[in-house]
């Protein structure tokens, strides 16, 4: 066999082998990115998803309230503030077809934020982040919207970034400022019962925010049956004092909205990234 044929053939075989190894052992959930949302892997059939009657992906965006959403201690409008000081307000946001896991009323959000502030106090020695409280618990507003998870994640490479879930969430909050007290002095951490659609095979989004922005987002859910997950130690956990990967993501996104890392930092290159470059253990 001629060497000019053999060398390209060997290179091609090596490339294919590396791709197979990567998909088999490192990127385990590739198959779930190409399967349609309505494909049931157990029965290997396509199922028709019946949306709640309150869902309206084609109409105007509206805040809705299902009968089952009405629970003791749940609030749908921001509670009165004890001061006008700048603070961060928590929101539990659900698409119309999302399961309510009660993160707002079973204190999972409260204990997650408490874990973040305990860690932050220890690392900074004397600082905490000022969150919005009501009766000594994190003041969390429950919001359900008349859009399905598919509406939030309807995005592909030929569309611009305005179509991603994060921008839709940001627009939703900014256009409903009337349900919040002292809106101008608040930033928001959104616990969204959904996910951000992948942009590439290597890009998995666990949280989003803008530098010096108004909104930070943590994705509390994932596409069904994925093996690898941003939420493997999600806020739905028994160890209420854990500062795990979820808490790290939440704090990371909140700090971005507060202007961290500073642009004058010697270990940042804002032309390439909003993250520090000299320490892998740095929260930023």
Question: What are the functions of these language-model segments?
Answer:
Residues 1-14:
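N-terminal Sec-pathway targeting helices
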Residues 18-34:
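Membrane-interface motif at the C-terminal end of an N-terminal transmembrane signal
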Residues 30-187, 192-201, 231-234:
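Propeptide-to-catalytic entry region of secreted or membrane-anchored zinc metalloproteases
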Residues 60-62, 212, 236, 270:
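Secreted/processed peptides and extracellular or luminal domains of membrane proteins
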Residues 86, 185, 214, 245, ...:
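Residues that flank catalytic or metal-binding motifs in active/ligand-binding sites
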Residues 88-92, 187-191, 216-219, 256-257, ...:
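Structural recognition of the beta-strand scaffold that forms the well-ordered cores
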Residues 199-242:
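Active-site scaffold of zinc-dependent metalloenzymes
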Residues 225-284:
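The catalytic-center signature of Zn2+-dependent metalloproteases
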């Amino acid at each position: 066999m001629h060497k000019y044929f053999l060398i390209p053939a060997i290179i091609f075989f090596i490339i294919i082998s590396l791709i197979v190894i990567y998909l088999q052992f490192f990127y385990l959930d590739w198959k779930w990115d190409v399967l349609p949302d309505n494909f049931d892997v157990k029965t290997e059939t396509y199922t028709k998803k019946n949306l709640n009657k309150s869902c309206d992906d084609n109409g105007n965006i509206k805040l809705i309230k299902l009968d089952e959403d009405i629970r003791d201690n749940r609030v749908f409008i921001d509670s009165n503030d004890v001061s006008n000081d700048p603070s961060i307000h928590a929101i539990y946001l659900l698409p119309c077809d999302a399961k309510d896991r009660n993160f707002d009323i079973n204190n999972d959000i409260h204990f997650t934020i408490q874990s973040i502030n305990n860690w932050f106090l220890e690392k900074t020695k004397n600082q905490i982040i000022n969150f919005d409280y009501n009766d000594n618990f994190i003041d969390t507003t429950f919001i359900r919207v008349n859009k399905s998870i598919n509406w939030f994640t309807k995005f592909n490479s030929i569309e611009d970034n305005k179509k991603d879930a994060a921008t839709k969430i940001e627009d939703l909050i900014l256009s409903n400022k009337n349900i919040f007290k002292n809106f101008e002095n608040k930033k928001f951490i959104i616990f969204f019962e959904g996910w951000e659609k992948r942009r590439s095979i290597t890009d998995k989004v666990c949280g989003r925010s803008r530098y010096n922005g108004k909104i930070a987002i943590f994705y509390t859910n994932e596409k069904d049956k994925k093996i690898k997950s941003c939420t493997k130690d999600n806020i739905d956990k028994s160890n209420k004092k854990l500062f795990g990967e979820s808490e790290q993501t939440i704090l990371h996104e909140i700090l971005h909205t507060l202007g961290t890392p500073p642009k004058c930092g010697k270990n940042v290159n804002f032309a390439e990234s909003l993250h520090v470059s000299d320490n892998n253990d740095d929260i930023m």
